[in-house]
């Protein structure tokens, strides 16, 4: 379950 990681990556990219 790396959904949080993916969301965090998106936020970090922003």
Swiss-Prot record:
Signal peptide: none annotated. GO terms for biological process: phagocytosis. Keywords: Cell wall, Peptidoglycan-anchor, Phagocytosis, Secreted, Virulence. It is a peptidoglycan-anchor. One of its GO terms (cellular component) is extracellular region. Its main location: secreted. It comes from the Bacteria. It is found in: Secreted, Cell wall. Belongs to the M protein family. This protein is one of the different antigenic serotypes of protein M. Protein M is closely associated with virulence of the bacterium and can render the organism resistant to phagocytosis. This is M protein, serotype 32. It comes from Streptococcus thermophilus. The lineage of its organism: Bacteria, Bacillati, Bacillota, Bacilli, Lactobacillales.
């Amino acid at each position: 379950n790396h959904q949080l990681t993916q969301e965090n990556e998106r936020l970090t990219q922003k």
